[in-house]
Regions:
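Short coil/linker segments at helix-helix boundaries
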Residues: 98-147, 151, 161-244, 253
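C-terminal motif of bacterial Sec signal peptides marking the signal peptidase cleavage site
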Residues: 15-17
Length: 501
């Protein structure tokens, strides 16, 4: 109850604080009473949710045209099932791309709460048990990198509103939440993978193999095991370079140098090539203008599938077929290659990549592929044992009846018909097992591909910024401009820009 109260209190604080679009010193322009009145209005007058009928074709068309409002409305009108959190993550990002920064910030906070509640109800063992029916039968609760991106996007939305005070609140919350939110999820994923590693050594598999042997099908697992993905031994993704970068800038903008240094240390651990020294040590009499650019959409995982033939089905003399499905991360082809930032004083820079989120997906897939493969083999064995054992027994009996059929022609025809129906039923059942086997490739689709930044040491004053999103050949894909940016001496001023192409 305490966590719930804290969460809804935070929502009210968000409504109250995200009202100024030109705040660079962490102070709110409104009085306390005005904030309270604003919060009450927000609390009593929730915006009406617009809904449209969802079709994939219409959604893809709207997205290609940059009609993010229609995309949001279609996701709101979609039946979510076990993908409620997944659809919420996409909706929240699309609201950001549509410039609905306050709505997006609030929605990300609510989604984080739902993600945590779902995760609290799940353990590694429960997840393994839930996947017996199929990988996609489980409720989607989000990945570690999506949890971290949710914090980042809340901070980005606050910065887009010019509210560095609320942005500080977000990074403060992350620092306090890590042990209770991120660390348990990491432990839960490790527990699932550990249980999956031993999936083929369980009593369920041993019993299933024995059942198949009783009807003459001997399964050779050596060929199946040969295609198993390697166990991931690389560095786990437990911290975000981008979130640490934002933390360093936000704390510096809020006159919290010690916390800024803590974030800078985490940034060095996540991405040693990035330095925020110039951002944290602004020369006397100078200001610092940092332009953060989110470009493209995050790379997508796909299904990898391997088919194996093992054992021989009696009577039919055909092999038993397995389909093993698991996630993979193929080479990606992104539209935006780089970002160029130009200030109104003519200064220009190519933005430095702070984080490529494809790497987070790649790590997530590599960590999960082996466990998913083992669970897929588990399902193939146990489902075939449950289905094929009965059907093969019936097939053997029907074949015997055909060979021994005597009597009238009608009786022989009936026996032949029974045999044919048994064969058809067996084939249909085996094909259904193969058709049902699918990898879980769910993920948020509209998070950015890259977070980049360009920092400028400038004289205090008012500036405008032009952000150009460039293709591999240097041609401009899209240009975003912002004006009336006030830069003060001694601290960073942060501007954010996004392009989802």
């Amino acid at each position: 109850m305490a966590k719930a109260a804290a969460f809804f209190a935070a929502v009210v604080m968000l409504f109250a604080s995200c009202v100024s679009t030109n705040v660079d010193d962490g102070q709110q322009d409104n009085s306390v009473s005005e904030q309270t009145d604003s919060a009450k209005k927000q609390k009593t007058k929730k915006p009406k949710v617009k809904k449209k009928k969802f079709t994939q074709e219409a959604f893809d068309k709207a997205y290609a045209e940059g009609d993010y409002a229609s995309c949001v409305a279609m996701l709101n009108g979609k039946k979510h099932g076990k993908d409620k959190i997944l659809d919420a993550l996409d909706t929240n990002m699309l609201m950001h791309l549509n410039g609905q920064y306050l709505d997006s910030a609030r929605a990300f906070m609510e989604t984080q709460w739902e993600m945590q509640q779902s995760a609290n109800d799940t353990s590694g063992g429960k997840s393994f048990a839930a996947t017996i029916a199929g990988e996609n039968s489980t409720t989607y609760t989000g990945t570690v990198y999506e949890r971290l991106l949710a914090y980042s996007m809340r901070a980005v939305n606050a910065l887009a509103l010019g509210d560095v005070g609320n942005a500080k609140g977000v990074v403060d919350t992350y620092a306090g939440d890590y042990k209770d939110v991120i660390a348990p999820l990491v432990a839960q994923e490790k527990a699932l993978e550990a249980e999956s590693e031993n999936a083929l050594e369980t009593d369920d598999v041993s019993s299933a193999l024995k059942s198949l042997q009783t009807v003459g099908v001997s399964v050779d697992l050596s060929s199946v095991n040969g295609g198993r993905p390697a166990k991931y031994t690389g560095k786990p993704y437990e911290h975000s370079a981008f979130l640490s970068y934002l933390g360093a800038l936000i704390y510096a903008a809020n006159n919290a140098p010690d916390h800024a240094q803590d974030s800078a240390r985490l940034l060095r651990e996540a991405n040693p090539s990035i330095s925020v020294l110039e951002d944290l040590a602004v020369p006397a009499g100078k200001g610092r203008l940092n332009v953060v650019a989110l470009s493209g959409t995050i790379g997508k995982r796909c299904q990898a599938a391997q088919e194996f033939s093992t054992g021989i089905i009696p009577v039919l003399n055909t092999p038993l077929k397995f389909k093993i499905a698991y996630p993979a991360f193929p080479a990606q082809d992104h539209t935006i290659s780089s970002v160029r930032v130009t200030l109104s004083d003519g200064t220009a820079k190519t933005a430095t990549v702070i984080e490529d989120f494809d790497e987070a997906v790649k790590i997530d897939v590599a960590k999960k592929a082996r466990g998913a493969y083992n669970r897929s083999v588990f399902r193939n064995i146990t489902k075939n044992a449950a289905t094929a054992t009965v059907s093969i027994t019936a097939l053997i009996a029907a074949d015997k009846a055909v060979k021994q059929s005597e009597g009238s022609i009608m009786m022989q025809i009936a026996t032949q018909a029974t045999y044919a129906a048994t064969v058809a039923g067996l084939n249909a059942a085996l094909n259904a097992i193969i058709k049902a086997e699918k990898a879980d490739v769910r993920q948020g689709s509209y998070f950015p591909h890259k977070a980049s930044a360009a920092g400028f040491t400038v004289n205090p004053g008012t500036y405008s910024v032009k952000v150009e999103y460039l293709s591999k050949d240097g041609s401009v894909i899209e240009t975003k401009e912002q004006g009336d940016i006030s830069v003060v001496a001694g601290k960073p001023t942060v501007v954010v820009s996004s392009c989802g192409k």
